[in-house]
Amino acid sequence: MGQRTPLFDLHLALGAKMVDFGGWDMPLHYGSQVEEHHQVRRDCGVFDVSHMNVIDVLGREAKAWLRRLLANDVDKLKTPGRALYSAMLDEQAGVIDDMIVYLTADGYRLVVNAATGAKDLAWMQSQLGDFDVQLLARSEMAMLAIQGPQARNRIAQLVSSARAELIRQLKPFEGLDDGDWFIARTGYTGEDGLEIMLPADEAQRFFNELVGAGISPIGLGARDTLRLEAGMNLYGQDIGEHVSPLASNMAWSIAWEPAERDFIGRQALESERAEGTAFKLVGLVLEERGVLRAHQVVRVAEIGEGEITSGSFSPTLSKSIALARVPMATADRAEVEIRGKWYPVRVVQPAFVRHGKTLI
């Protein structure tokens, strides 16, 4: 038996198929993964993401410490509520984790991956040194993600007028405190929506309200196909300690300036950049019948081989898509080995669908 979120019994009552995910018992789907996927793209749905880890960074030197810890620069965050995406690297520029960082009224809030929480916290504590910084793991909080083009409108109808106004005014990649709730306009689906951190007992009530109002519960299966269509990395598959952000479509999240900011992993990244990154993360589209899966070999004629990191059937596109790490010189065509046969694939930018629009 794995760890359970505060909503475990509600998932069972809704008929969820439960699976292990990073040591947590989580809902894979509530009947049809494909229908749940379409529901989020076309309207909205609610995910239980209480397995994610929330860590508050407090103290006089929180900003200075995070500027050393992270590849992106929290100095960009000038107004409480603003957020950014960053990798946390080791000295060899391997990705320990990726996360969202919010500037709050009294410090910073980090939202890190479920399976890496203990590892992340141990690494952070090992890097504290003499910094005047306190780390507070907010394990008492639950987290719901309401995602889809109608998410904010639907939620605004179910909360107080003051909270509804806050939701309407939130900008993308912004999160604000509202009493015991922290409401952010972020997500992992490629659609607009909210991620709400709130006390566990309130999460149960609110989840029931959402479902009672006709907002469909969505499982991890659809969450995975939604994020894959959006070209969003999954830790442990597309990124990890074995690979740098330069080979993971994450170069945009590295703050190279100011040059004197000596973040962990910078020296290794600069060496890699100077020598030239050997691999890149791309999107693949299979035009024939078949399914692209992680670890399938990608062959690029006269250049070399790579590997699929994530792959699945795309419900939106009605064809198989994948993220793959391939040689840097790869152009627009490659082949993938599926059950001993080679199939041609198109090589595209690693984003297939966002905000309901096809990008390939």
UniProtKB/Swiss-Prot annotation:
GO molecular function: aminomethyltransferase activity; transaminase activity
Group of enzyme by EC: transferase
Source species, domain of life: Bacteria
GO cellular component, one term: cytosol
Key words, A-Z: Aminotransferase, Transferase
Reactions catalysed, as given in the entry: N(6)-[(R)-S(8)-aminomethyldihydrolipoyl]-L-lysyl-[protein] + (6S)-5,6,7,8-tetrahydrofolate = N(6)-[(R)-dihydrolipoyl]-L-lysyl-[protein] + (6R)-5,10-methylene-5,6,7,8-tetrahydrofolate + NH4(+)
Biological processes, Gene Ontology terms: glycine decarboxylation via glycine cleavage system
EC number of this enzyme: 2.1.2.10
InterPro entries (UniProt xref): GCS_T, GCS_T_bac, GCST_C, GCV_T_N, GcvT/YgfZ/DmdA, GcvT/YgfZ_C, TrmE/GcvT_dom1
Function: The glycine cleavage system catalyzes the degradation of glycine.
Family of the protein in this entry: Belongs to the GcvT family.
Quaternary structure, from the entry: The glycine cleavage system is composed of four proteins: P, T, L and H.
NCBIfam families found in the cross-reference section: gcvT (TIGR00528), PRK00389.1 (NF001567)
Protein name per its UniProtKB record: Aminomethyltransferase
Native species: Pseudomonas syringae pv. tomato (strain ATCC BAA-871 / DC3000)
